[in-house]
Amino acid sequence: MTTTSAFMLSVRLDNVAVVAIDVPGEKVNTLKAEFAAQVRAILKQIRENKALQGVVFISAKADNFIAGADINMIGHCQNAQEAETLARQGQQLMAEIQALPVPVIAAIHGACLGGGLEMALACHRRICTDDVKTVLGLPEVQLGLLPGSGGTQRLPRLVGVSTALDMILTGKQLRARQALKAGLVDDVVPQTILLEAAVELAKKERLAQRTLPVRERILAGPLGRALLFRLVRKKTAQKTQGNYPATERIIDVIETGLAQGSSSGYDAEARAFGELAMTPQSQALRAVFFASTEVKKDPGSDAPPGPLNSVGILGGGLMGGGIAWVTACKGGLPVRIKDINTQGINHALKYSWDLLETKVRRRHIKASERDKQLALISGSTDYRGFSHRDLVIEAVFEDLPLKQQMVAEVEQNCATHTIFASNTSSLPIGDIAANAARPEQVIGLHFFSPVEKMPLVEVIPHASTSAQTIATTVKLAKKQGKTPIVVSDKAGFYVNRILAPYINEAIRMLTEGERVEHIDAALVKFGFPVGPIQLLDEVGIDTGTKIIPVLEAAYGERFSAPANVVASILNDDRKGRKNGRGFYLYGEKGRKSKKQVDPAIYKLIGVQGQSRLSAQQVAERCVMLMLNEAARCFDEKVIRSARDGDIGAVFGIGFPPFLGGPFRYMDALGPGEMVATLQRLAALYGPRYAPCEQLVRMAERREHFWTNGETDQGN
């Protein structure tokens, strides 16, 4: 065997070469620039061995093929030319793999993403396992980039242009059966026979060429291609609002390769990669990626976590059902649900059944896996089965005496080490723990709805919470697949506190006569996934506004909502999507009607509904209040760092990722510009816009939230 660090070459007795990929000291394989020489040395040996019948590339890691290229390489590039050179080096290496004179097979188990899939595309055939960990995709667009090692050229020719555009523009990941159906892989086999199946495929003297589906062949022609690209450009522009330049360049590069040939396509790909790497959008998106990676590694405290073998949940409603699902099906932990009646328990069980059954129908998992995961969830109307639970999460009504009662019951019926975690969105954790016998084991664990989709959780220790309780709760959140940030026990915590003034200002502009659709469109244009009015409808107007009085009582008039407006809307039985009528009209199944905005809303609040502000003015009024409040949270140490503040806003409320989060955005604007803008708005609209002391100090000292050592690279 010849060993060259991350790549190991061995030749079997049947004259098939096996290249095992195993990056030393890393949990996952990532491609680095220094590996090029190692791979070329192996390719040279393969070319010189005339007896070889084929080659198999396979990972020696337990559950991943290649997770992508090392993103730090991009951060080391000083200009577009250096990044372009990096792409061309990758293209050349993939071309050398493709040019090998014998069949080359990629044997894929686990994640095959980014540069990993580009390497697999350079192989002549691909075979993968049917494991749930096996996913294939090109997610570079999520970093403001495009695939730079030939992916934009090879993928359309393999699976067809429409499928390739969909994959590259969205960064979506295909599971094994989806990849087989798309033609991305040639076979799907159990992991136990992956290597042997790949070897047998490599031994075949002639590998049959795959024929594209009729639809893809039509779209590959000049007329079909012209129509497709016109539609894709229009749809993409509507979705990105011009905020993500990578999507436009992806379309251009793929079209160039199909219209002018792969050589021109590779040139266009490398140039676009270099230019995109230097854009502020890519730098911000990479910063979010590195920050989220760091947060996921953060243990929350210096203490070791306590035992975490099973979990209890109080309440089988929407939140309780979602928490049960992520705990059992994502975390693999046994869950016991307690509700006051069997209907609540059945609701929670059905919640998990519906989600798992959808996965079965889509062939993401097998029915046996569904049954195995569902078996982890059980329920009762009393505390039977709770005595050994390591952590209990309450998801009951926002009622302080009720939650205090839950603490007492858990302390009576569970083990002395059991942690009590409250899913409250507004009540102080210290108040919930006020009468606790073991207050050091009481903590907040705030999930966002829908639980199965929203990636963020806030972990909220109160003054007496122990370091071990924090560490154990953070560990649970990570097992649930969540990104946890630890925040202080102050009214609204972090996410809801910065969201409230943003939504309040949108409602205030509504009372000034601005139209609902104009307000929402302005914030979508700015970069939010939905506008503030639609967000309130989605969350539930009653639920979303419940925290306003709490915040107003804690922080004063800057959190007051427009007088009587919210009450008028709620008194008219408008709760949003959940009851079919809010600011928007909804059909029976909760879908928006063609009419969308309910015109009666303007009469209800006593305005005509005629917009006078520009989209930029609307966005500025909402966003500047959010930024100012985020700076206050930083000053008051509600969040531990700018990193946590950025991740909380991006993952919790959809703050535009291409801006990097509120703190990177404020740094980009500059504290002086922030203060000047807020002072201008305060003169126009009142003292709620007065810049906070933190921003004023930073402007005077010319400071930033992110220090010079905290770049867009991983540490």
UniProtKB/Swiss-Prot annotation:
The record marks E118, E140 as: Important for catalytic activity. This is Fatty acid oxidation complex subunit alpha. Its main location: cytoplasm. It catalyses: a (3S)-3-hydroxyacyl-CoA = a (2E)-enoyl-CoA + H2O; a 4-saturated-(3S)-3-hydroxyacyl-CoA = a (3E)-enoyl-CoA + H2O; a (3S)-3-hydroxyacyl-CoA + NAD(+) = a 3-oxoacyl-CoA + NADH + H(+); (3S)-3-hydroxybutanoyl-CoA = (3R)-3-hydroxybutanoyl-CoA. It holds the Pfam family 3HCDH. It is found in: Cytoplasm. Keywords: Cytoplasm, Fatty acid metabolism, Isomerase, Lipid degradation, Lipid metabolism, Lyase, Multifunctional enzyme, NAD, Oxidoreductase. CDD domains: crotonase-like. Coiled coil: none annotated. In the N-terminal section; belongs to the enoyl-CoA hydratase/isomerase family. In the central section; belongs to the 3-hydroxyacyl-CoA dehydrogenase family. It comes from Salmonella typhi.
